[in-house]
Amino acid sequence: MIENLDKLTSEQLEEVKKQLTQINSSIEEQQAQPIAEFFNKHGWVKIDKIINKETADLFYLYCVLATERLNVLEQIEGVGNVNPHHYGMFDDPQATGDYSKYGDLIFDTLLYALNDKMNLYTGIDLIPTYSYHRLYTTGTELTKHSDRPSCEISTTLCLGFDNSNLDKSKYENYLWPLYVKEKDGTEIPINLEQGDMLIYKGCELEHWRDRLMGNNHAQVFLHYNDKKGPHNIKYDGRPFLGMIDDEKTTIY
């Protein structure tokens, strides 16, 4: 505890603030070191509660309302007549029928905001490429795949889900596992609670999900590149964050 804090000059207070910031930064780096070591050994690592419940609830509701908005727009304008770049789509081949959207500003903001933590958790100097969010629905299966270069270092963050259709006596703690295949062939199931995030090497590790049993499940994917790597695709070729993918200056 700092004594006589009320007697310090403004310059002294600023110096104290600076020193405390440096101490906190050093502590955070020390705590992140074993996380980065695990990530670089296995190609993935799980981070618990990267965002709190209140923030996750807000993002989950955002995904649900965006889905309902697109449903209403398609009823008014007709299927295929709504701009997917602005309002999202239901025809992503990876999850046909489920709502998906590329590069939404709110999630690109989250992508940007987590950049420093991602640097610590991976031990890599990263650059943000793009975000992508999706609201999965009952029966959706994510087939085994790896990702394109802009997804070199990826995250998938659980925003929330609705399992109210399930029999609680059988599925009281049901989570929808994500599987990753490590380089040695080991297949690892990873369960994410609301607010949890998985960091993984999207281009190297195959990943997939079995069929979803719950009503819905919202995830956001946050993608990064290694600044010193072969790709370094800033903003996925877009001029800036929050821009739609047909405004790319470079195609990857």
Question: Where in this protein do the model-derived segments appear?
Answer:
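N-terminal secretory signal sequences
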Residues: 19, 43-44, 55-58, 161, ...
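Non-heme Fe(II)/2-oxoglutarate
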Residues: 2-121
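A structural signal for short, well-ordered beta-strand segments and their strand-loop junctions
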Residues: 46-49, 127-129, 199-200, 221
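Acidic/histidine-enriched, glycine/proline-rich intrinsically disordered or flexible terminal extensions
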Residues: 235-252
